[in-house]
Amino acid sequence: MQFLQNIPPYLFFTGKGGVGKTSISCATAIRLAEQGKRVLLVSTDPASNVGQVFSQTIGITIQAIASVPGLSALEIDPQAAAQQYRARIVDPIKGVLPDDVVSSINEQLSGACTTEIAAFDEFTGLLTDASLLTRFDHIIFDTAPTGHTIRLLQLPGAWSSFIDSNPEGASCLGPMAGLEKQREQYAYAVEALSDPKRTRLVLVARLQKSTLQEVARTHLELAAIGLKNQYLVINGVLPKTEAANDTLAAAIWEREQEALANLPADLAGLPTDTLFLQPVNMVGVSALSRLLSTQPVASPSSDEYLQQRPDIPSLSALVDDIARNEHGLIMLMGKGGVGKTTMAAAIAVRLADMGFDVHLTTSDPAAHLSMTLNGSLNNLQVSRIDPHEETERYRQHVLETKGKELDEAGKRLLEEDLRSPCTEEIAVFQAFSRVIREAGKRFVVMDTAPTGHTLLLLDATGAYHREIAKKMGEKGHFTTPMMLLQDPERTKVLLVTLPETTPVLEAANLQADLERAGIHPWGWIINNSLSIADTRSPLLRMRAQQELPQIESVKRQHASRVALVPVLASEPTGIDKLKQLAG
């Protein structure tokens, strides 16, 4: 494995949720400890539960791992860190500023950027503690800061003075006010990250087109700010032996090999390792030790793993329920790569096929959806908005209005603030909201939705409500986009996830965030499930068994309505395949 050769003191793993960062970081830590190195493993992944992996309690203080001599671990809870961080900023102003101002500030500090910055605050303590490198040869982190966070930390000028003069404009600069450590410490931490003698960054991906494109963007973004010592690990690759006697396994293998042969050009030059798909979840030292093997695990015979099929309705049953209202807004929500665009297209095609008037609006960057579907069904209209164009338009508007009075340092801060994920969400939602009102007469299906945090920022603790109420007078009837989304009679939010631990946890967090904004998801779609796919591959059957607890947890803990969609042998593009998916 190339990424394991001549490892510097700090090793960071980065990649989207569910690609295997924590498993690979744990396996790496074990491998190094077995070589006689003293290793500290730092986990900030809320889904990881490193303690469960090693069968012992791990907390916010360094604990020796009993089962692996030489290995210690530490868990940083990013949500708890963010909560303490918020309290540091908000508690001193409670009772001093009006309640609505405090509430607005609290909301600015409730997004992903705050969690990210609070976690980096904790990282900084570890990266700048010289005594740790006398106790440990390697410190391994199972997540890495984003380029956006590092750029914010690199920017000159006082964050707090910028925030004081722009209280209503800062979505990601608000959190900077709570940074406790000295600027020199952050500068040292960023310098340590950029030094190839001290830090190696491992990008973790699966062989899926969207995941690889996302990793390529991360690679470029981090390289541009000096983090150039990067390696690529492709995890969960199906062994060729599984493809021999099974149609589905053969199709998956071919799809993955094609993705491997056509890696994004930006990734082609990186030292790359591949890890095989494992039959069981990575819990316990023996399972983790096998993960870094260059040989696939021998599978049992397929008869040993007869499939237990979960009793959960198909997507068509969910669409039949949706159709009863005869019109309405259908919004699909979920993390990147879970299949929102495909699910939205399948729902729209099925509704149109049932005779309803449907407008499918997509932010699919590939634009293949609009090309495949447009004009194919008489009562299906397809429109596409370009997230990059909309974001750029929104950024220019903010820079021309709020940026007008700022000095150069202030403008640079505002420009970086406008690179936050919240900005794209707001811009895309504003573009989508142009068609939302059509949902009173027909079905409007959207393949993306803003988070609860973004909606609350947009709604600014009801300021939008009050402004419209003032204009309409007491007797006027009015509806803001927020009110429309909060009305279950008119809007159905569907969460899309995968039957794996991290994607389910991420979807549950999205649901909790929407509920803070008074929006209750109507149902969940669990996509890409092996548990209801037809396969004789022993490895895929074993993986199907691993899905069952996750599917059960969605059904019991998170959703009143669930649909299960199988892994498909070929990509569902075109009317006929989409009809099959939701038919």
UniProtKB/Swiss-Prot annotation:
InterPro entries: AAA+_ATPase, Anion-transp_ATPase-like_dom, Ars_ATPase, ATPase_ArsA/GET3, P-loop_NTPase
Recorded catalytic activity of this chain's protein: arsenite(in) + ATP + H2O = arsenite(out) + ADP + phosphate + H(+)
Family classification: Belongs to the arsA ATPase family.
Purpose: Anion-transporting ATPase. Catalyzes the extrusion of the oxyanions arsenite, antimonite and arsenate. Maintenance of a low intracellular concentration of oxyanion produces resistance to the toxic agents.
Keywords: Arsenical resistance, ATP-binding, Nucleotide-binding, Plasmid, Translocase
Residues given in the record as ATP binding sites: 15-22, 334-341
Entries under PANTHER family matching the protein: ARSENICAL PUMP-DRIVING ATPASE ARSENITE-TRANSLOCATING ATPASE, ATPASE GET3
Top-rank EC class of the record's enzyme: translocase
Membrane is among the record's keywords: no
Translocase recorded as keyword: yes
Name this protein carries in UniProt: Arsenical pump-driving ATPase
EC number: 7.3.2.7
GO molecular function: ATP binding; ATP hydrolysis activity; ATPase-coupled arsenite transmembrane transporter activity
